[in-house]
Amino acid sequence: MINILEVNETNKMIEQEKLDVRTITLGISLLDCCDSDLDAFNRNIYDKITRLGKDLVSTGREIELEYGIPIVNKRISVTPIALVAGRACRSEEDFVEVAKTLDKAARDTGVNFLGGYSAIVSKGTTPTDEALIRSIPAALAATGRVCSSVNIGSTKTGINMDAVKLMGEIVRETAEATKENNSLGCAKLVVFCNAPDDNPFMAGAFHGVSEADAVINVGVSGPGVIKHALEDVRGKNFEVLCETVKRTAFKVTRAGQLVAQEASERLGIPFGIVDLSLAPTPSVGDSVAGILEEMGLESVGAPGTTAALALLNDQVKKGGIMASSFVGGLSGAFIPVSEDQGMIDAVNRGALTIEKLEAMTCVCSVGLDMIAIPGDTPASTISGIIADEAAIGMINNKTTAVRLIPVIGKDLGDTVEFGGLLGHAPVQRVNGFGCADFINRGGRIPAPIHSFKN
């Protein structure tokens, strides 16, 4: 029986508290598109993406109108291109042509991003992997909707430090290649440890080889809803606090489950997972930082921040997992600086540093995300930050990632405008002491002792 109070509560969550479904992401396998001829390969991937994705945007809009739940993004992820392009691509320029084909497919289907210009090099790098990675700066400069990711480590395999070194250089080169646009290419490039196969969120989404031919994955959001719920229990003990977050996360996830099932049924594509992540936006009131401050912190970055974030992350999982038949992806709280007004404010007031953000990544969903750093930051320093994050992920058996933006021509204290959901960010201080000799050693960091489970 429909309860009018619950109907009103849902309406309030959507209209006043910024509840939305952040993304419907269609994952598409390109394993059957391989060809030794580059033109044929490009034709195969374009045809498959546009055939399966042609109704994604219109279906999302229909569900929005029918149920009144905003669906912010409709996106596509594909099999990591390094796995399928080896026969067709013989040079970096060939890979850039593939990126342009992906970009055209994204435009023609109407999605705002397409992820999967990716390589999985957690234990070693093939010549194809390296060619794709070295093509990333040119590919992101030549496209508007293509997103790239590289997985450089895992708990089972350790960390590929040769790839870590290379990715520091690639981030720098991408910043240079897109410097006319505030180095925006780096906002579409993520370096992972323990990357999941079914992540619906950009820029790190790709369609893993363990997945079906096509699946629908949905990413929910709702920081504003949880913040409003916590306002009603201000000053209560931790038991009440945890229960409130958990119950609210359940309601938010049910909305995502409904949208996922509807999209799956209407498109005739299997439902994959709901990602429980709390994804903020630059809008006032849609902030993960706001939740932490509502718990009692004077500012994000204050002592207690990591504990508050750990509590939030755990209760979101506990509430959300009951609300969906399949949960996956990243599933936790995102802490992107440029996309969260509360994080931006904390950086500006001096409360939040990169080092504190790194500590927070030990207990939350992803990692150092959308952080603007000085444009003259050395590649070896970027590699060192990537290695630190990868170590956290490897040792703790969790996904971690780095999306740093060394903004060419900007320095400490400047503010960079990225626009849209990417927001804006103050340029943050990076530790000035070097780590080049450490990064230049090369080779691999072995997997941790507790990874041997067999």
UniProtKB/Swiss-Prot annotation:
Instruction: Tell me which Pfam families the record gives.
Output: DUF711
Alphabetical list of PANTHER family matching this protein: UPF0210 PROTEIN MJ1665, UPF0210 PROTEIN SPR0218
HAMAP family, per this entry?
Answer: UPF0210
The record's annotation in NCBIfam families points to: PRK05313.1 (NF003700)
Name the family. Belongs to the UPF0210 family.
Q: Which CDD domains match?
A: RNR_PFL_like_DUF711 (cd08025)
The protein here is known as UPF0210 protein Memar_2269
> InterPro entries recorded for this chain?
UPF0210
Gene3D superfamilies cross-referenced by the UniProt entry: 3.20.70.20
What lineage, starting at the top, does this entry show?
Archaea, Methanobacteriati, Methanobacteriota, Stenosarchaea group, Methanomicrobia
The species is: Methanoculleus marisnigri (strain ATCC 35101 / DSM 1498 / JR1)
Entry superkingdom = Archaea
